């Protein structure tokens, strides 16, 4: 019978090296808090329970993860990793296997942890890694036959022990009953005056319990995050992983080192993503979608064959099939482009529906607007949707043509097939199939001089 699993996540550290007012574990990797990554991995192993030991910033950490069905355990004071596990262990049945994870080690894969649990096999298992520069890490000690005899922390290691490059990651699996007994025997007679969880390894050896060290293949999986330099390194590892996964799924990413996914992503085959693209929130791309360089997409859904040109920002927008967006376009929340619609360079939209085949090509603002089918909006056209108190809508019928430099003062309706003369300020509804021109008559004032060219005061007087 497979042994039941309980997971303990250590998340009580202060994170002083982050130099931040926020708890370390709330700093994001891939758009999600570090601890969120660890919890997702933990629950993927289908444990009986997950216990999170927290301390510094406890209320903020718990509030940010309120949707997770975890047991929160406060460690106060914080006296080391062994002391932290001791706070959670009483609630775990003796016949469970315990897996200890760390909230600031966000990149470990579920497959690695499954291998560690299998390697432990009723004994004690620890995850080890070979670091070319092991400074700061606890060293795994072995006897002449290669059997694990213990772990010594860097500060407590001798010169000979510091030359060992096999390091302890801190991730550990052990039988709950035995772990409880070992934790009761811990002392803090060490350089940091803390209760080290790693001391249970020597206890296991002394008690004749098999100790297995499972070496992780990719050191990046177990890289801890203690400062912002390490946070940035973890971010790039995470992003590279996501990029490679999507490339294997049929998405072309021109440079996986310049790709940022910070939320949920779904894409059809043959999508193409250029350099410097940032995807946030929930982004869904149909087949054959192309995203140009240095675009930001946040909570966006794009239909098959749609193309977004360089330096465009899309937020809370949707587009149908074969749309063209940008370059330098900004689509704000509530924007919906029907099939074949086009929003061109330096165009901003907000709460606007652009109908099938309609075009807003240049230097325009469409806010709180409804455009029908095959509408053409000339350069420099804006909807004046806000009167200082309320927002008002503009409706433009199928096939309408709006001349350049037009102001549509909402609420207003432009009829089907209507034409608006360039430079008009439209304040009343424009009828179907009619030309509407709303601008003052042109006049020329002869002899007019600019202010700097006007004669001095008193020039030509008899005084």
Swiss-Prot record:
UniProt entry tagged with the keyword Lipid biosynthesis: no
Alphabetically ordered keywords of this record: Acyltransferase, Cell shape, Cell wall biogenesis/degradation, Cytoplasm, Magnesium, Metal-binding, Multifunctional enzyme, Nucleotidyltransferase, Peptidoglycan synthesis, Repeat, Transferase
Region (Linker): 229-249
Biased composition (Basic and acidic residues): 453-463
Transmembrane segments annotated in the record for this chain: none
Enzyme Commission number(s) of this protein: 2.7.7.23, 2.3.1.157
Region spans: Disordered: 437-463
Binding-site positions, acetyl-CoA: 379, 385-386, 404, 422, 439
The record's free-text note on cofactor binding: Binds 1 Mg(2+) ion per subunit.
Family in the record: In the N-terminal section; belongs to the N-acetylglucosamine-1-phosphate uridyltransferase family.
Subunit structure: Homotrimer.
Listed name of the protein: Bifunctional protein GlmU
Organism: Alkalilimnicola ehrlichii (strain ATCC BAA-1101 / DSM 17681 / MLHE-1)
Name of the gene encoding the protein in the UniProt record: glmU
């Amino acid at each position: 019978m497979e042994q039941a699993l309980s997971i303990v996540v250590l998340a009580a550290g202060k994170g002083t090296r982050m130099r931040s007012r926020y708890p370390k574990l709330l700093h994001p990797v891939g758009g999600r808090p570090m601890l969120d990554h660890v919890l997702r991995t933990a629950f993927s192993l289908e444990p009986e329970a997950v216990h999170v030991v927290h301390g510094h910033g406890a209320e903020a950490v718990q509030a940010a993860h309120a949707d997770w069905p975890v047991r929160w355990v406060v460690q106060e004071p914080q006296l080391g990793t062994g002391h932290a596990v001791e706070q959670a262990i009483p609630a775990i049945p003796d016949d469970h296997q315990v897996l200890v994870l760390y909230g600031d080690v966000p990149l470990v894969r579920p497959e690695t942890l499954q291998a560690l649990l299998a390697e432990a096999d009723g004994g004690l298992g620890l995850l080890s890694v070979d670091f070319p520069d092991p400074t700061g890490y606890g060293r795994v000690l072995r006897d002449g036959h290669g059997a694990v005899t213990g772990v010594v922390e860097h500060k407590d290691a001798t010169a000979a022990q510091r030359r060992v490059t096999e390091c302890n990651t801190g991730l550990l699996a052990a039988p709950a009953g035995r772990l409880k007994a070992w934790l009761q025997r811990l002392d803090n007679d060490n350089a940091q005056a803390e209760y080290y969880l790693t001391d249970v390894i020597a206890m296991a050896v002394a008690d004749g319990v098999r100790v297995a060290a499972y070496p992780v293949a990719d050191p990046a999986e177990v890289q801890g995050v203690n400062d912002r330099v390490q946070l940035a390194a973890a971010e790039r590892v995470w992003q590279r992983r996501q990029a490679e996964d999507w490339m294997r799924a049929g998405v072309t990413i021109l440079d996986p080192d310049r790709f940022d996914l910070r939320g949920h992503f779904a894409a059809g085959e043959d999508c193409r993503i250029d350099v410097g693209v940032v995807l946030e929130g929930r982004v869904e791309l149909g087949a054959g979608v192309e995203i140009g360089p240095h675009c930001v997409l946040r909570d966006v859904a794009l239909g098959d064959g749609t193309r977004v040109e360089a330096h465009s920002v899309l937020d809370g927008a949707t587009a149908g099939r074969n749309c063209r967006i940008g370059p330098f376009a900004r689509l704000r929340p509530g924007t919906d482009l029907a099939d074949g619609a086009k929003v061109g360079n330096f165009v901003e939209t907000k709460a606007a529906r652009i109908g099938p085949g309609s075009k807003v090509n240049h230097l325009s603002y469409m806010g709180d607007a409804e455009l029908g089918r095959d509408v053409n909006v000339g350069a420099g056209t804006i909807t004046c949707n806000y009167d200082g108190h309320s927002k008002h809508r503009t409706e433009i019928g199928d096939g309408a043509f709006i001349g350049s430099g037009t102001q549509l003062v909402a609420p207003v309706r432009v009829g089907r097939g209507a034409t608006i003369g360039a430079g008009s300020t439209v304040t009343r509804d424009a009828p179907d199939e009619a030309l509407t021109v709303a601008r003052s008559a042109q006049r020329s004032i002869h002899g007019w001089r600019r202010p700097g060219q006007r004669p001095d005061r008193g020039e030509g007087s008899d005084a």
